[in-house]
Amino acid sequence: MKDVLQWAIDHYETRDQLVQKGIWKGELYHDSIFKENSRGWLWKALLLCDENNNCLLTDNFKGLDLNQFGLVPVPMLADGDNYDENHNANVPKRVLHSNVSSSVGIRRLTPVEAVEKHPLSDDNDKTKGSLSKGSDEKPLTLRETLEIIDLDLSRIMLDDIFQEPKVHAQMRQLLYNYLLIHQSEHLQYKQGFHEILSVIYLQLYHGTDLDNTDLQNVLIIFNKLMNQIEPIFYNEENLINWDKRVFTKIFRICLPDLFSKVFYQPPKTGSGKKKNVDHLIHSNLIWLIRWTRLLFLRELPLKYVLIVWDHVLTFNYPLDIFIACTIITLLLSIYDELHELVSQGDYEHTNNNDEFVELILHFKKIFEKEDASKDDEKFLDLCKVTGNLCELWYGKNYDDMRLICDTFINAKFGIKTSDVLSMETAKLTIDPNRQSLENKLRERVRQTILKNKKKISQ
């Protein structure tokens, strides 16, 4: 870690330089500069510097331990204890230190039955129908909450260290303290929290148990990340609204052909003639639950999950937009498989969406056959495409968003979408300035892909 720390100090004076050059331009990932055990340092640099983003890396994090008062121990509950929220009056105030910010909103704990059937399960049948309003759910007691946490922690398969009793106890304490931080919002534990926390814990773990300072830093990083993802993706109503308000719109702009065949189809009238208005026939939520709540932990190899999280933790873009654009980019990476599926002759007539959902829920297996899963440079290119889509979305440059995707598909897979074909037939009528911009965008994507192909062939 000292090597990458010294390299970063020599190259970046501020957090902003680390973000823009080191992460978004990919400098940290070149020439094996970035070691596997350096990510804990990087995440502390991103999240433990001051709010003005002018933290000097040469400070070496001295004095940046925001939660100075330690963690609250998990209560020992004897048989028959009826511990409820009234006992929280005796909780030491140190865990509610003002520097550990919280979000606003009321969440409900996943019901007991969700321990056996929750939406993050790999089982597709279990995932269907998993969304519930949550308004009628009865909040669980502390004992029930800790029992679910213990069960979830025992199932973590990210690394063998999570089977060690001391690590289990520390993870349990971290989750308990996270819930205490947000006790005024009535936030309660849900499946998925433990998996997000396990990734962060693992990055600060270097072969020995975490000391109290490390545990506090894990909690701060976890809390800041969850402040962004929990209100949107762990709240069923907000997730549905995000799908309609953000994801569906971006999906339709970037991949209109795929979108129309998978989710929207023109209904037929009684006479067999089609109406003019399309209608939504399938929901994205069956698979979006897992993709969003776990931030791609089940969809990508861990080393690429960590790269995505590096970009997430820069918070260059609001998380709801960044996640939507990341999903689109990942779908672009397997567009050939998706295109083959929806191009079947009878797909529109027999489409019940099962095949598409099955393919998406096995995304990791398909992705691992693609070049981007074997070449860090190509995966970093996908991250840059995500950033470009975010920028264009904010600028309302929807045509350029589609152009980037069409060009990527054409250059990588040789598939010409309807938009590429229509542009080729309309070249004479396109404004010259517009044509110049489109050519530059198309050439940039083409050169990037050709450069990566040359590297592989050498």
Curated annotation (Swiss-Prot):
Is Methyltransferase found in the keyword set? Answer: no
What InterPro entries does the database record attribute to this sequence?
Rab-GAP-TBC_dom, Rab-GAP_TBC_sf
Annotated Rab-GAP TBC domain residues: 33-316
| Taxonomy, superkingdom | Eukaryota
Q: Which Pfam families match?
A: RabGAP-TBC
Q: Return one GO MF term.
A: GTPase activator activity
Family annotation (Gene3D superfamilies):
putative rabgap domain of human tbc1 domain family member 14 like domains (1.10.8.270), Ypt/Rab-GAP domain of gyp1p, domain 3 (1.10.472.80)
- Say where the protein is mainly found: cytoplasm
Q: Name one GO cellular component term.
A: cytoplasm
**Modification Phosphoserine, positions:** S436
**Keyword RNA-binding attributed:** no
Assigned keywords, A-Z: Cytoplasm, GTPase activation, Phosphoprotein
Give me the ranges of the annotated region Disordered.
Answer: 116-136
| Location of the protein in the cell | Cytoplasm
Entry function: Stimulates specifically the GTPase activity of YPT6.
PANTHER family documented for this protein: TBC1 DOMAIN FAMILY MEMBER 5, TBC1 DOMAIN FAMILY MEMBER GTPASE-ACTIVATING PROTEIN
Additional record remark: Present with 2990 molecules/cell in log phase SD medium.
What this protein is called in its record is: GTPase-activating protein GYP6
